[in-house]
C-alpha cells in the first residue's frame, strides 16, 4: 500500500497607507507587499503480512516514509509616492526595506512491526524504526528507536474458569524509545550568519551562531507494567 499527501499554501499580502493622511503622510505614503509559499508532501509505502495457523496469529508490517517541507518568503516596502491610489512598488521612490527567506526540511523513516499471539492468551509485539532528519549533521542524522511489549490474559487460563465474575484479567509490560528532532532550528548544526549588516554601498555579514555538529536526536525511554481487571 502506498499513500501520497500534499499540502500547498500561497499567500499574498499588501498593506497601503495613502500619502495624504495618517503617519505615512510624512513619507509620502507607504506600500508593503509580501508573498509566502509553502509546499509539503508525505509519501509512504507499507507492506503487511498476516497469517493464522490454529492457535497462532502473526501480523508483520514493514514500511518507508518520506516527508519534505519547503517554505519561501519575499517581501518589500517602499515610500515616496507622487500621488495616492498607486499600488505598485515601482511607483514609489524610496526602498524602506526588503527581505527574503527560504527554509527546507526533510525526514526519512524506515519502520517495522511484529505482533504475535497464541490462543488469544499470550501476546508479544516488537517494533523498530530508524529516522534521518535534515536538522542534524550527516554524521548524526540517523536515530534508531525500538519497543518491546508482552501481555498475558490470565482470565483465559483454565484455572480462572471458576471465577466467572472476572471477565478480563491482564498483565502487561512494555519498554520503548521515541525520538524527537524538534530542536527549534532547521540548521542548528551549521554556522549561521546575519547578512543584513550594510555599511555604505556594500552589504556585510556577521556570524549569528556557531555550528554544532554534535547535535543528535532527543531520545525518550518509557517502561511500564500494568495489571488490569474488569468484571
Regions found by a protein language model. Name each.
Residues 1-15, 25-231:
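Extracellular/periplasmic, surface-exposed regions of secreted and cell-surface proteins
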Residues 21-22:
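N-terminal transmembrane signal-anchor/hairpin module of polytopic inner-membrane proteins
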Amino acid at each position: 500500500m502506498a499513500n501520497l499527501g500534499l499540502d500547498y499554501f500561497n499567500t499574498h499580502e499588501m498593506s497601503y497607507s495613502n500619502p495624504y493622511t495618517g503617519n505615512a503622510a510624512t513619507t509620502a505614503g507607504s506600500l508593503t507587499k509580501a508573498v509566502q509559499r509553502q509546499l509539503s508532501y508525505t509519501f509512504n509505502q507499507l507492506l503487511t503480512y498476516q497469517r493464522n495457523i490454529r492457535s497462532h496469529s502473526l501480523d508483520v508490517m514493514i514500511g518507508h516514509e518520506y516527508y519534505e517541507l519547503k517554505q519561501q518568503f519575499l517581501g518589500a516596502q517602499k515610500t515616496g509616492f507622487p500621488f495616492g491610489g498607486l499600488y505598485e512598488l515601482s511607483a514609489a521612490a524610496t526602498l524602506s526595506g526588503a527581505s527574503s527567506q527560504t527554509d527546507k526540511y526533510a525526514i526519512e523513516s524506515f519502520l517495522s512491526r511484529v505482533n504475535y499471539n497464541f490462543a488469544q492468551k499470550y501476546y508479544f509485539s516488537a517494533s523498530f524504526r530508524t529516522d534521518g532528519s535534515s536538522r542534524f549533521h550527516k554524521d548524526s542524522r540517523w536515530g534508531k528507536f525500538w519497543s518491546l511489549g508482552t501481555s498475558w490474559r490470565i482470565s483465559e487460563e483454565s484455572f480462572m474458569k471458576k471465577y466467572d465474575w472476572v471477565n478480563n484479567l491482564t498483565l502487561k509490560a512494555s519498554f520503548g524509545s521515541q525520538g524527537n528532532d524538534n530542536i527549534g532550528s532547521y540548521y542548528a548544526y551549521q554556522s549561521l550568519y546575519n547578512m543584513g549588516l550594510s555599511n555604505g554601498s556594500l552589504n556585510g555579514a556577521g556570524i549569528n551562531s556557531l555550528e554544532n555538529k554534535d547535535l543528535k536526536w532527543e531520545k525518550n525511554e518509557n517502561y511500564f507494567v500494568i495489571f488490569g481487571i474488569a468484571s
